[in-house]
């Protein structure tokens, strides 16, 4: 395990308190560049843009915000900002700039003003975690909300009007699932048949697949809760498929997080069954692949830190997303598909963490790590890229270059003679003023 040091960092001002899932990265204004969204317990959403230390704009919500998200939740072809409070208030913000420009050619309808939601609706309270994704394979995105009482609910936006620009609909409840343990993460991954599957983490490094049975329903649209409580319990039990990832669990109640749909390459390389990762508060990390018969464990790593957040991020640029896990003390682990581990230390305690693409500088999205500390600061480490995950040395790098072998042949050095090539490289790097030693025997250390 090697350590890396990222030095490109910006500090953002944030004086509020937040829940772990009230932070995300996404394109809130539909300009193809991602912003940072943070919601606090006072009901304020701060949107940060570029490397400005102060929020680009703020939004006012009702209640304590527990989760925020960015996505096309209304299926209108543009992203909206979603904020959900613990009291059950669902807020939608349209932060796309107006099409009409002012005299200077800038959109100033948003900047400097506190934004009000374009839509607000009350849903069941005690929200904890949120997901905006297509969970049933119909091409439309749904809203999935996890609750503190071990319940998960799925909603869909139902449009009531004809206008494509204005929101004239409402959220309609699709299904309610009852889980055995606390819900800490929601994610979607590709199943063995290539269709999306809704996953929810369960304590003890376990997870459950939630079946979207409304796809089979015909007739009336899905109701919010069903006719009676008794008619819900039996289907709910059938529609939750629990998976234990280990026969030996040290603590079956330990908090667990998961992330799914981990990319395995560009284009056709990323097709097939989805990869997903799990982490626990006692330091267990696993990468798994969902197979048709049984899940396949690709690797398992045990660390001595309390892991509270799990993300995915392509830090090498090869299309393979690495698993990123963060601990409360700022220790961050980046692990690739081959179990190569790189760690990065932030010298402060962390209250919330996220990773993804963010347009911090240079007018483009780059891989970023975002840490919310306890000292009223948010640290954004941008351009967190690595040339490779595995450890290497100069000789191995040079051996991949054809001109290296031709130069050694000119000097009469055998490329397979490692002591001689190392001595030659040492002399070239540290004693270039000395005359070159062409004979292989003269390159060897007399001692």
From Swiss-Prot:
GO terms for biological process: cellular response to amino acid starvation; cellular response to glucose starvation; germinal center B cell differentiation; negative regulation of TORC1 signaling; regulation of TOR signaling. InterPro entries: Integrin_alpha_N (IPR028994), KICSTOR_ITFG2 (IPR031793), WD40_repeat_dom_sf (IPR036322). Keywords: Lysosome, Membrane, Phosphoprotein, Repeat. Part of the KICSTOR complex composed of KPTN, ITFG2, KICS2 and SZT2. SZT2 probably serves as a link between the other three proteins in the KICSTOR complex and may mediate the direct interaction with the GATOR complex via GATOR1. The KICSTOR complex interacts directly with the GATOR1 complex and most probably indirectly with the GATOR2 complex in an amino acid-independent manner. GO terms for cellular component: cytosol; Golgi apparatus; intracellular membrane-bounded organelle; KICSTOR complex; lysosomal membrane; nucleoplasm. Transmembrane segments: none annotated. The modification Phosphoserine is found at residues 104, 220. As part of the KICSTOR complex functions in the amino acid-sensing branch of the TORC1 signaling pathway. Recruits, in an amino acid-independent manner, the GATOR1 complex to the lysosomal membranes and allows its interaction with GATOR2 and the RAG GTPases. Functions upstream of the RAG GTPases and is required to negatively regulate mTORC1 signaling in absence of amino acids. In absence of the KICSTOR complex mTORC1 is constitutively localized to the lysosome and activated. The KICSTOR complex is also probably involved in the regulation of mTORC1 by glucose. FG-GAP repeats lie at residues 19-48, 126-155. It comes from Homo sapiens. This is KICSTOR complex protein ITFG2. It is found in: Lysosome membrane.
């Amino acid at each position: 395990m090697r350590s890396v040091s990222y030095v490109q960092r910006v500090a953002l001002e944030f004086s509020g308190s937040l829940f772990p899932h009230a932070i995300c990265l996404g394109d809130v204004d539909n300009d193809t560049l991602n912003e940072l969204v943070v919601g606090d317990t006072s009901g304020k959403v701060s949107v940060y843009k570029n490397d400005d230390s102060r929020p680009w704009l703020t939004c006012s919500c009702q209640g304590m915000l527990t989760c925020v998200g960015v996505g096309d939740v209304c299926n209108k072809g543009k992203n909206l900002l979603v904020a959900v409070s613990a009291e059950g208030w669902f807020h939608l913000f349209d932060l796309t700039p107006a099409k009409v420009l002012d005299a200077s050619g800038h959109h100033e309808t948003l900047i400097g003003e506190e934004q009000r939601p374009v839509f607000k609706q009350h849903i069941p309270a005690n929200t904890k975690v949120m997901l905006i994704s297509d969970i049933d394979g119909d091409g439309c995105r749904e809203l999935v909300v996890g609750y503190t009482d071990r319940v998960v609910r799925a909603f869909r936006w139902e449009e009531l009007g004809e206008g494509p620009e204005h929101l004239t609909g409402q959220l309609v409840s699709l299904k309610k699932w009852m889980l055995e343990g606390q819900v800490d993460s929601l994610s979607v991954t590709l199943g063995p048949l290539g269709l999306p599957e809704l996953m929810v983490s369960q304590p003890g490094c376990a997870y459950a697949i939630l079946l979207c049975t409304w796809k089979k329903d015909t007739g009336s649209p899905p109701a919010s809760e069903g006719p009676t409580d008794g008619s819900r319990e039996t289907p709910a039990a059938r529609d939750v498929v629990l998976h234990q990832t280990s026969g030996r669990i040290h603590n079956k109640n330990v908090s667990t997080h998961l992330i799914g749909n981990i990319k395995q390459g560009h284009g056709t390389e990323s097709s097939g069954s989805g990869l997903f990762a799990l982490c626990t508060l006692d330091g267990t990390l696993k990468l798994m692949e969902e197979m048709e018969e049984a899940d396949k464990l690709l690797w398992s790593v045990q660390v001595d830190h309390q892991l509270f957040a799990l993300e995915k991020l392509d830090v090498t640029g090869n299309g393979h997303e690495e698993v990123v896990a963060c601990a409360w003390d700022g220790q961050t682990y980046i692990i690739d598909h081959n179990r190569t581990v790189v760690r990065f230390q932030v010298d402060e305690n962390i209250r919330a963490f996220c990773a993804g693409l963010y347009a911090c500088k240079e007018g483009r999205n780059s891989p970023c790590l975002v840490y919310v500390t306890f000292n009223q600061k948010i640290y954004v480490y941008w351009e967190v890229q690595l040339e490779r995950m595995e450890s290497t040395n100069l000789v191995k790098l040079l051996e991949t270059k054809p001109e290296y072998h031709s130069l050694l042949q000119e000097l009469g050095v055998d490329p397979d003679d490692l002591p001689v090539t190392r001595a030659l490289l040492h002399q070239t790097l540290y004693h270039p003023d000395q005359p070159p030693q062409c004979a292989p025997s003269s390159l060897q250390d007399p001692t």
